[in-house]
């Protein structure tokens, strides 16, 4: 039963042929994850992973790097990857109606002021004054939940200035790059696929950022196909524009499934979080040698400014981690007032 379910969930292709014996891929994958786990050092995976000349290395690099971390092997810390984060045993699955719909329904009775840009936070007095494009909000305390991409960009000015170490944490727990190119088909080109993950052999070797992506097919029976280029390659692809992202993703799928998928294509959509001014990246992780800044980032300032969001969460890289971290910080504030 496990083998059948496994084969339903994962597909591996070399060119246009599905591989039934995937040992070559998983050998490189298992050795890479084992090497990262074994080191327990605050170094980059590229310094420790073996089989870097193997023909499946770029695919493994894509899975463990840009797909899981939003970063290439040279840009994140093994210690951050290995840290014992509190990931729910139930797993994280796609919401068919969209996660935004879930959040909107869950908090529909919560008073929220949308489309209000914060430009400054003054914490020099006994409380805080939050400057927005719709006026100033005064409070005893506040929670900052924006991404480290926004924090490191300087869009929000803090007065007095934050400590040098706190400022540095915005840069050291840096944003990865992970973009989503989604296609909707009249019918799936892969039969019986549901919540299926597809990996393929990425041929171009000797690149610091693999030029490919992993694919999620038919999440929650939506008939969608989500291609997720990430890392520096994904960042540069986003800069090239929406058409470039669509063309690249569709051309890679055609190499696997052939030009016949064109006739079943209904819609396409591209999300480039790296170019979105509200995020300026996908999610955050520690750079090599910078794992200690995770804790620095979580610390409150003057018992008045609290920080939450996925970069501070122990359920890292997830929307539920961001939600839980915000709830936890709110509870701290309520108990302290």
Region locations from a protein language model:
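FAD-dinucleotide binding site
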Residues: 1-337
């Amino acid at each position: 039963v496990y083998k059948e379910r496994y084969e339903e969930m994962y597909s591996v292709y070399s060119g246009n042929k599905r591989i039934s014996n995937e040992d070559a891929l998983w050998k490189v994958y298992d050795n890479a994850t084992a090497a990262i786990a074994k080191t327990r050092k605050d170094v980059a995976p590229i310094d420790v992973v073996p089989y870097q000349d193997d023909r499946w290395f770029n695919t493994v690099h894509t899975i463990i790097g840009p797909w899981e971390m939003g970063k290439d092997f040279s840009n994140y810390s093994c210690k951050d990857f290995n840290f014992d984060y509190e990931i729910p045993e139930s797993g994280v699955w796609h919401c068919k109606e969209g996660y935004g719909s879930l959040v909107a329904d869950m908090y529909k009775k919560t008073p929220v002021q949308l489309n209000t840009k914060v430009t400054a936070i003054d914490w020099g007095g006994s409380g805080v004054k939050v400057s927005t494009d719709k006026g100033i909000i005064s409070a005893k305390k506040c929670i900052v939940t924006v991404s480290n991409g926004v924090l490191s960009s300087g869009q929000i000015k803090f007065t007095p200035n934050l400590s040098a170490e706190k400022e540095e944490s915005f840069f050291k727990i840096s944003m990865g790059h992970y973009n989503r190119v989604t296609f909707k088909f009249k019918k799936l080109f892969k039969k019986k696929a549901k919540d299926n993950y597809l990996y393929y052999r990425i041929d171009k070797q000797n690149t610091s950022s693999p030029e490919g992506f992993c694919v999620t097919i038919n999440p929650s029976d939506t008939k969608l196909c989500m291609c997720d280029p990430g890392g520096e390659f994904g960042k540069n692809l986003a800069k090239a524009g929406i058409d470039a992202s669509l063309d690249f993703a569709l051309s890679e799928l055609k190499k696997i499934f052939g030009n016949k998928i064109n006739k079943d294509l209904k819609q396409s959509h591209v999300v480039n979080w790296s170019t979105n001014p509200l995020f300026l990246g996908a999610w955050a992780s520690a750079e090599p040698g910078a794992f200690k800044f995770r804790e620095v980032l979580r610390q409150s300032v003057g018992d008045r400014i609290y920080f939450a969001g996925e970069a501070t969460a122990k359920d890292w890289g997830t929307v539920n981690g961001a939600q839980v971290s915000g709830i936890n910080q709110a509870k701290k504030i309520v108990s302290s007032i």
